[in-house]
Amino acid sequence: AYNSNRIEGSRLTEDQTRYIFETRLIGFKDQEAVPVDDIIETTNHFVAFDFLLDTIDEPLSETIIKEFHRILKTGTADALKPYFNVGDYKKMANEVGGKETCKPNEVANEMQKLGEWYLSQTNVSIYTLAEYHWRFECIHPFQDGNGRVGRLVLFRECLRNGIMPFVIDNEHKLFYYRGLYEFEQTTGFLVGTMQSAQDVYESWIKYFNEELLDGLKID
């Protein structure tokens, strides 16, 4: 929740995110005021991750992808905009990084084709997921929140396919965006960034496993 929202511009710190998760409170004494949507989208991210785990045995579908978006954007200022279409595909054209994305009237067809391509893959690898993610972000199916939805899908599909999951933290942010931007010319940059993030995530797992084992020894 912290990393994915952080690279999208959330001003919540890691400690603040942990505080919200553990206490469900939003008061931060003697600290900078935080936009309400940052709070809402962070708490929504916790719910979205629970949904991710609850549906982990189901094949990826447009229904699941749309539900990620609905959960993430419910209660935000965007949800009050009549054109925003929370939990469904965009009604207005948008762009990412100065590049045009899929036209609204073409999104449903393009998402169907993307889903069919992905489900036809017999051996999903980190390369498959990189291509899926790039295609998804090129379509940019939602009015906003595409990056967060796309990264939740990446994490989910890593778990489903026995691949080390990862999060794109602030240190990987620029490499990640460059990898998406240059994917047509070279797939290696995005894949390499994802693999680097996997190494970080694996080191977290090892650290917490060691802490857990040390705790059990003390007990």
Model-derived segments and spans:
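FIC/Doc superfamily catalytic core
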Residues: A1-D144, R148-D219
